[in-house]
UniProtKB/Swiss-Prot annotation:
It comes from Salmonella typhimurium (strain LT2 / SGSC1412 / ATCC 700720). Mo-bis(molybdopterin guanine dinucleotide) binds at F260, C261, K262, P263, G264, R265. InterPro entries: Cytidine_deaminase-like (IPR016193), FdhD (IPR003786). Its main location: cytoplasm. This is Sulfur carrier protein FdhD. One of its GO terms (cellular component) is cytoplasm. It is found in: Cytoplasm. It comes from the Bacteria. HAMAP family: FdhD. Belongs to the FdhD family. GO terms for biological process: Mo-molybdopterin cofactor biosynthetic process. Keywords: Cytoplasm, Molybdenum cofactor biosynthesis.
Length: 278
């Protein structure tokens, strides 16, 4: 197995395909021409030789995705419980082969579920409706964020969507430092997958990634709130709206949820005490 920090070294063009498309503009149906379309492939997460989940995803940053999914789904509590990963092609897509600790693998087998992937679907394969909104340890109130610094982050979020710039087809998730600087970010055709990539990256970065907040380019669903809380993220900013269940879960687990984030404005759904308005 390769070191868990190993990543696929590919160019942005490896995540797009040129296809012949016909463009329409008012009163003008143009002749077919080549344009970029985002790649979407089945990605199987295989723990100790057993396939656990198949998700539709962009074929990059997959070790970060596997780490983030493992943490946000409660398969592991610490990156140290994964000993290594390899990304390998399979007949229909890609596999991330994960070397999981024996103790965690026994627990995984006890709760095993088969997820058949729609794009970034966080609910597919849950065996009972009662499994939705599983209990999350309430978060501490150890973080604060000055909303005056959010504009800087919003301005540069698009920098982490190179495939999105070519295709208009990806979501982004980025880590915002207290200063508003973006420490890093990831993109994917699935918003949940983009967030898992960010959470996996954060788990393997240094202490500077402990302070700050997560920022997503999409709406905030309950799964995204729950994944963030499972990974100890206290503040989640979303460019679009939040759902009612997302607000309920955020309230229950002490997560500060903020939606409709635009320059100079935002909607605070839960726990505003972490936020400073300058």
């Amino acid at each position: 197995m390769n070191n868990i920090l190993s990543e696929e070294v590919l160019n942005v063009t490896d995540f797009t395909t040129s296809r012949q498309l016909t463009l329409w503009k008012r009163e003008d149906l143009q002749s077919p021409q080549l344009d970029d379309v985002a790649e979407e492939v089945p990605v199987a997460l295989v723990y100790n030789g057993i396939s656990h989940v198949v998700m539709m995803a962009s074929p990059k940053d997959l070790t970060h995705f596997a780490m983030g999914f493992s943490l946000s789904e409660g398969i592991i509590d610490s990156p140290r419980e994964i000993y290594g990963m390899d990304v390998v092609p399979s007949c229909n897509g890609l596999e991330v082969q994960i070397d999981l600790s024996s103790r965690r693998f026994m627990g995984l087998k006890a709760r095993r579920r088969a997820l058949a992937g729609r794009t970034g679907c966080g609910v597919c394969g849950v065996e009972q409706l009662n499994d939705i909104g599983k209990p999350v340890q309430p978060l501490p109130f150890s973080q604060t964020f000055n909303l005056g610094n959010l504009d800087r982050a919003l301005k540069h979020l698009n920098d982490f969507q190179p495939t999105g710039k070519l295709t208009g087809c990806t979501h982004a998730a980025a880590w915002v430092m207290p200063s508003g600087e973006l420490a890093g970010g990831h993109e994917d055709v699935g918003r949940h997958v983009a967030l898992d990539k960010l959470l996996g990256r954060r788990a393997t970065e240094g202490e500077e990634w402990r302070q700050g907040a997560a920022l997503v380019s999409s709406r905030a669903s309950y799964e995204m709130v729950q994944k963030s809380a499972m990974c100890g993220v206290e503040i989640l900013f979303a460019v679009s709206a939040a759902t009612t269940l997302a607000v309920e879960v955020a309230e229950r687990c002490n997560l500060t949820l903020v939606g409709f984030c635009k320059p100079g404005r935002a909607t605070i759904y839960t726990h505003p005490q972490r936020l400073i308005a300058d």
